[in-house]
């Protein structure tokens, strides 16, 4: 399809200039139709040559960073305890229940913030507080209904608090596109699929395939989260690049201290960058980063942020339709 070939051009360095001297920097992308779950385009790797081995769109498990916040924190807060975009959450010095200080990306605290401000500026402390306010089993129900597989002990549904900032065994772009789809379409989940129909060779019988539609959140929850994430799309320059209403969430992750020390990386080195964005018609999730660690090759947080946003802008131009259609207010 046209979308697939334009996406390939970005991934194969024809229409996007990848950062210099970063040969092992990778990416994976998945785009689906938001009203059906049908897969529209897949980017399995940068410069994929020869046999398809590992697909970074479907076969990885990477920590999802702040793209977790609408799923584990604010979505459940709005859905189950009737929060509004104006609910106040205090951004202050704060610790996990089990100890361990939660810090923000800028190592500062901003005091009283609305839910809108907390999510737009991706503050970690308000995210953890939001996660703690909602019944843990309800959060589990919410994210699993969206296709996310959280990190739990055998036979338990208890979610540890680091899920609030996406620090768990992780996900992949196709699963993340599926999860955000419910925010784009008024609260429905369709499992992503790629086969439209099956024809039996003997009898020529045709079976059309479609994904089951499941209502997973109220239309008002979907709209409130979307309304906030539209601001992030403007903040990252994606809205103006695409020229149509779009909502998105960004995420980055950190290396743990041992890895930093063993590889000799600076503390601001970042292994993963994420963006999950959507219009009323299409959802596209992208991971970019390092699948393997090579001594001497890394991205600083600032480099990752700028590459991540620029790569997503290029992919967004390739994949999103310029319909001008906005999200429906319930």
Specify the residue positions occupied by each region the protein language model found.
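A penicillin-recognizing enzyme superfamily signal
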Residues: 1-18, 29-31, 41-42, 49-60, ...
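Short, small/polar residue-rich loop motifs at catalytic or cofactor-binding pockets
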Residues: 23-26
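Structural recognition of the beta-strand scaffold that forms the well-ordered cores
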Residues: 28-32, 39-43, 88, 117, ...
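Active-site SXXK
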Residues: 37, 63-89, 118, 178-183, ...
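Gly/Ser-rich catalytic serine loop of serine hydrolases
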Residues: 59-69, 167-170
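Conserved catalytic neighborhood of penicillin-recognizing serine enzymes
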Residues: 82-139, 160, 189, 201-231
């Amino acid at each position: 399809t046209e979308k697939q070939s334009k996406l390939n051009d970005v991934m194969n360095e024809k229409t996007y200039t990848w950062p210099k001297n970063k040969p092992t920097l990778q990416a994976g992308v998945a785009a689906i139709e938001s009203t059906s779950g049908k897969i529209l385009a897949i980017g399995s790797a940068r410069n994929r040559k020869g046999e398809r081995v590992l697909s970074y769109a479907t076969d990885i498990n990477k920590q999802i960073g702040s793209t977790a916040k609408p799923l584990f924190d604010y979505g459940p807060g709005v859905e189950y305890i009737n929060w509004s975009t104006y609910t106040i959450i205090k951004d202050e010095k704060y610790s996990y229940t089990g100890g361990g200080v939660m810090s923000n990306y800028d190592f500062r605290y901003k005091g009283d913030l609305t839910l809108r401000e907390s999510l737009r500026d991706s503050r970690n402390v308000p995210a953890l507080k939001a996660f703690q306010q909602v019944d843990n089993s309800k959060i589990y129900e919410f994210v699993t209904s969206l296709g996310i597989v959280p990190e739990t002990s055998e036979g338990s549904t208890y979610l540890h608090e680091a899920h609030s900032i996406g620090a768990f065994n992780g996900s992949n772009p196709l699963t993340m596109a599926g999860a955000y789809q419910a925010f784009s379409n008024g609260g429905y989940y369709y499992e992503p699929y790629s086969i439209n129909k099956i024809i039996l060779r003997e009898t020529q019988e045709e079976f059309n395939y479609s994904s089951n539609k499941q209502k997973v959140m109220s239309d008002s929850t979907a709209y409130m989260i979307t309304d906030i994430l539209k601001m992030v799309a403007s903040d990252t320059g994606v809205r103006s690049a695409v020229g149509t209403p779009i909502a998105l969430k960004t995420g980055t992750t950190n290396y743990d201290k041992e890895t930093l020390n063993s590889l000799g990386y600076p503390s601001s080195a970042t292994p993963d960058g994420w963006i999950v964005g959507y219009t009323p018609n299409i959802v596209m999730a992208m991971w970019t980063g390092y699948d393997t660690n090579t001594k001497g090759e890394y991205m600083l947080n600032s480099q990752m942020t700028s590459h991540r946003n620029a790569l997503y802008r290029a992919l967004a131009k390739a994949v999103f339709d310029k319909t001008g259609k906005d999200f429906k207010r319930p």
